[in-house]
Amino acid sequence: LAVADARTLWHTAHVSGAASLEALLGTPVAFDARIQDARGQDGQRDSAALLRALLENSEIRESHRDGDPRVQDAYALRCMPQVHGPVLDALRFAEGLIGRELNAATDNPLVFEDGTMLSGGNFHGQAVAMALDVLAIAMTNLATMSERRIDRTVQQDRNQGLPPFLARGAGLHSGVQMGQVTATR
């Protein structure tokens, strides 16, 4: 279930990342397939493809096509494929390993069709532990990137004119400030 939840979170990070790019008037140029192909990492390619699909009908994206003076966005926006992609690679590793483990014989002793009974160490859970450790590291990186986008979105000096903490009447209302504080803990 943890792996399935991680897959859902990976996809959700792309949806929220695309929404952040839109809210911050970012450009999707960094997700161009040619950039991803130059790196040659499968997860990165797939991440960028998902972001391009999510932004396909974006009116904000269209506003960048002609004469946009900006060269590049903040790392938290333009480096999503470079962070989300390795998370997908780790997720695929964990899915494969855990899938094989779910289909494995882990009893001890093992009894074979010919009646032979052999004691071994297939019960040891190191493979699953390592897969989940890799997944935990990957998900931490995904969360860190998301927190950086949240921070950029709520900080008035960096959020392209959105109200501070996304609240009307900042000072009186905290908006999503506590959500951002929670994300840093």
Where are these regions (language model features)?
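Glycine-rich beta->alpha junctions and the first turn(s) of the following alpha-helix
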Residues: 1-11, 167-175
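C-terminal catalytic subdomain
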Residues: 126-185
